[in-house]
Regions:
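Short beta-strand segments
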Residues: 52, 111-115, 155, 178-185, ...
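Conserved A3 ("GATE") glycine/threonine-rich loop of ANL adenylate-forming enzymes
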Residues: 57, 160, 184-187, 214
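A charged helix-plus-loop insertion that forms the helical arch/lid used to bind
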Residues: 124-135
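ATP-binding/phosphotransfer module of carbohydrate and carboxylate kinases, centering on a glycine-rich
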Residues: 1-109, 118-124, 143-151, 164-174, ...
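A short acidic/small-residue loop/turn micro-motif
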Residues: 76-78, 133-134, 204-206
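Short, charged low-complexity linear segments at domain edges
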Residues: 190-206
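Short hydrophobic alpha-helix segments
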Residues: 73-75, 129, 200
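A glycine-rich, Thr/Ser-enriched phosphate-binding loop motif common to dinucleotide/cofactor-binding enzymes
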Residues: 154-163
Length: 369
């Protein structure tokens, strides 16, 4: 296991640091980068850590009392799964604290997003397709134990990213906001009356599984016609693969080879930038279905803003967001759709660690389990 650690101050030396804890024999790479601007939602008592847990990497960051990121540490998630991933999360926090010049005991709270359904109250991850051996993982308890009893807050990763955008990104000052994150799937989160809405059993915001076409394309959950079956990267590349099988030609085969299911969001963006008509038509179809979903949500909740984030949106950029917004504005019942602001995520890759730090702050004052 190798951890890359970064000091977010101009005083970083650039020298390698040895790890401590479970990563005592690992290599660390330290360099100076610009600090994150302070934000009120990130400010609080003492230092906190935010963890962005993904299927391929674990990123941890330390936030100062004024909300500035002072250090980061990154480690691969690995293929072992189970408790090994929890060890890696703890090691990343420990190293980020060390690089910041802190003892682990000086970290007051830790927050983490998890790419899976999770109960924030019990702290149990029920299952995750990206991490083996995490069925009913008591993450809150296990991570806290490995960090010497530091309080831990956990939540779904997209919900955490939406919290970040509301507290320190595109949605600052917005009372009612929806976040939609198209990526491998389509995740979402709801901010109602200034607070994240979790529902009766903590699963509110599963926007990817609203039905937009009865009996439509199969979804990974087993249903049909869900938003995720039309607007995720997985759905986009499946549609492109079908068109190629039917005889359509696309530059994407030159970029990724004949196995189009390997295409990343950046590959789709590259093909679109080259004017690939097949890719552009599928992305236009994606924007159309996403607009249908957004209009339905707008009619139900009447939010002020929809923030679009995730790998697909980050790769395709403002043109895609504007295409979606244009299609939303022409949907029926214009009272909810025309005034709706539709914007891209402002925090990008930092949304995960930022939202995780915010839920740690909220836990400190009793606003998050």
């Amino acid at each position: 296991m190798t951890i890359d650690a970064t000091l977010d101050t101009s005083g970083a030396s650039g020298a390698d640091h040895g790890a401590h804890g479970d990563a005592s024999h690992e290599e660390f790479h330290v360099q100076a980068v610009a600090s994150h601007a302070p934000g009120n939602a990130l400010a609080g008592e003492g230092y906190v850590a935010g963890i962005d847990l993904g299927g391929t990497k674990v990123l941890a960051a330390i936030f100062s009392p004024d909300g500035t990121i002072v250090s980061r540490a990154k480690v691969v998630t690995g293929r072992i799964g189970g408790i090994d991933v929890v060890d890696r999360m703890a090691a990343a926090v420990s190293e980020a604290a060390k690089v910041a010049g802190l003892n682990l005991s000086q970290v007051a709270a830790v927050g983490t997003g998890v790419p899976a359904p999770v109960n924030p109250v019990t702290g149990v991850v029920h299952m995750t397709p990206n991490i083996a051996g995490w069925e009913n993982m008591p993450l809150k308890q296990e991570l806290g134990r490995r960090l010497g009893g530091i309080p831990v807050a956990i939540d779904n990763d997209v919900r955490v990213a939406v919290i970040a955008e509301h507290g320190a990104g595109a949605g600052v000052g917005i009372r009612n906001m929806v976040g939609i994150w198209p990526g491998t799937g389509v995740g979402g989160g709801l901010i109602l009356d200034g607070r994240i809405y979790t529902g009766s059993s903590s699963y509110a915001g599963e926007i990817g599984h609203i039905t937009i076409k009865e009996g439509g394309a199969p979804c990974g959950c087993g249903g049909r016609g869900h938003l995720e079956a039309y607007c995720s990267r997985t759905a986009i590349v499946k549609q492109l693969e079908k068109l190629v099988r039917d005889g359509k030609k696309t530059r994407l085969t030159r970029i990724v080879g004949r196995d189009l299911l390997r295409a990343k969001s950046s590959d789709l963006a590259e093909a679109a930038a080259l004017g690939d008509a097949v890719v552009m038509s599928v992305l236009d179809r994606t924007a159309r279905y996403l607009a249908i979903g957004i209009a339905s949500i707008a009619n139900l909740l009447n939010p002020e803003m929809v923030v679009l984030g995730g790998g697909v949106v980050e790769a395709l950029g403002d043109d895609f967001v504007e295409n979606v917004a244009k299609r939303v504005r022409v949907q029926p019942f214009s009272a909810t759709t025309v005034p709706l602001k539709i914007v891209a995520s402002a925090l990008g890759d930092d949304a995960g660690i930022t939202g995780a730090a915010i839920i740690a702050r909220q836990m400190q004052v009793g606003l998050h389990p």
